[in-house]
Design a protein with these regions (language model features):
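Short, contiguous alpha-helical
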Residues: 31-85, 128, 132-176
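Hydrophobic alpha-helical packing residues
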Residues: 17-20, 24, 55, 59, ...
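Extreme N-terminal tail/first-helix region
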Residues: 1-18
């Protein structure tokens, strides 16, 4: 099945989301919402959820173009690999202008529930995605440019890894 590598990425995405949540297991709600050092940990989770849900909404809309979608190119693959390397690093940079201030008023339980709904929508999107469009550039990443579905799901993984560094910094600053 041509989507098998994408399903494997979804399993990895789930595992790494759980890793992110484990980083909050020993924190109080007060610590999770502490904005003394920029975004709180809950805001980081909210940002990741908003990025994933917004991406799925965007791709759902773009997929309506069907065969008119452009091909995922070699240059696109190159830009994706560069972006992947940057996202896996601990380097910091300003978020793209399309990123809004994430909500920080969720409890950890509410955040998990919201993100679980988003993840379920992501899985349903992948399951319903037509195999004949797998090589099409259905997603526009703010840095990498146009990506295919596998690249989009991969970018969710690397985006989470990037913010894992941020959560580690926040934990260190609050003395954890």
């Amino acid at each position: 099945m041509a989507k098998q590598p994408i399903f494997k990425k979804l399993v990895l995405l789930d595992k790494e989301t759980e890793d992110l949540y484990r980083m909050a297991d020993d924190l109080s709600e007060e610590e999770l919402h502490d904005q003394s050092y920029g975004w709180s940990i809950i805001q980081v989770y909210s940002h990741l959820n908003m990025a994933e849900s917004g991406s799925i909404r965007y791709m759902t809309k773009k997929m309506q173009a069907g065969d008119k979608l452009g091909q995922f190119t070699s240059f696109g693959r190159f830009r994706y690999m560069l972006t992947k390397g940057l996202l896996q690093s601990s380097l910091r940079w300003k978020a793209p202008k399309v990123v809004s201030q994430p909500k920080g008023d969720f409890s950890l339980k509410e955040m998990r529930e919201e993100w679980a709904k988003t993840r379920e929508a992501t899985k349903q999107y992948v399951e319903a995605y037509p195999e004949h469009l797998l090589n099409r550039a259905v997603y526009k990443h703010p840095f990498a440019g146009r990506l295919d579905l596998a690249g989009a799901i991969g970018s969710f993984i690397y985006h989470q890894r990037h913010h894992m560094h941020q959560i580690k910094r926040i934990r260190k600053k609050i003395g954890r």
